[in-house]
Amino acid sequence: IADNKGACEVYPAPFAVFLNQDDKTYVEPDVTVVCDADRLDDKGCNGAPDWIVEIVSPGSYRMDYLIKLFKYRTAGVKEYWIVNPVKETVQTYFFEGNEDSMQYSFEDEIPVSIYSGFSIRISALLA
């Protein structure tokens, strides 16, 4: 993102995201990307970040694929990725416009929908 002169900031876990802006209920995604600095304070992100990435584990399938998917979509998150290290796949959701869901392998160049012209190949990050 920085290489492309982007204004977005990346925050790895632990990083609190207060989806309801209530200072009580929050989630801690594995990776959070915030493009609006006004949403940030000393506690974390207030309101929906632009992009969330969750790394699924065997015990978190229901949480990541159902519960968090619903929470993030209804809260206004623009893009949500679920990374499955066992299957070496990434399920992407773009909640603006057509709300498409796509599945990619770790070897694919995965387009970042919120950031035109930017893509990520997971295998390159793990090398």
Language-model-derived ranges and their functions:
Residues 1-5:
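Short helix-capping segments at alpha-helix termini
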